[in-house]
UniProtKB/Swiss-Prot annotation:
Protein name: Calcineurin B-like protein 7
PROSITE patterns linked to this entry: EF_HAND_1, EF_HAND_2
Localization per record: Cell membrane
Keywords, alphabetical: Calcium, Cell membrane, Lipoprotein, Membrane, Metal-binding, Myristate, Repeat
Feature type site, description Involved in dimerization: 140
Upregulating conditions: By salt, drought and cold stresses, and abscisic acid (ABA).
Organism the protein comes from: Oryza sativa subsp. japonica (Rice)
MF terms in GO: calcium ion binding; kinase binding
Amino acid sequence: MGCISSKQFKRAAEHEDPAILAKETTFSVSEVEALYELFKKISHSIFKDGLIHKEEFQLALFRNSNKKNLFADRIFDLFDLKRNGVIDFGEFVRSLNIFHPETPLAEKIAFAFRLYDLRGTGYIEREELYEMVLAILNESDLLLSDDAVEQIVDQTFKQADLNSDGKIDPDEWKAFASKNPALLKNMTLPYLKDITMAFPSFVLNSGVDDEEL
């Protein structure tokens, strides 16, 4: 993979300078440049406009641009920092930074909280947790009965909802996640230290490869 100069970034689509992105994240300049190659691949898979649309994001994650999944939607929404329906290169790098092994645990916990807080109320409610558990199980090809899913939700609230008000606030979530590190197992991608051309999927062991694009 060849190096990409700042001039090439500007010519491409006024993308942010990799040196600036490296200063703001745990990535090195060379890692940011490698991520740019990956970003180009994904952002030109369908619309070819230098921005990642939801369909392209889903194709990269699930190899299916038409698949509807709450989990994929939530990840896309959290990556779309400007909330304009697309992901630009700066958003791509800053969002992937959450999954870097050297990113502080507190930031990973906060991201996971926002992931489950579907309606953006500042709390995780039972219905939100139930919906997310179903979505994650669906993508993991795990089939559980409704009763089993309810038990997962019940146990989570029993342990996390310390003041028993029927919702989990950020402090309760932080305490719960700290005691249950398995919750964040998908929040660290070791191979982000050694960037490759495979999309670092935190849902499935899949990627976007040359043959498919």
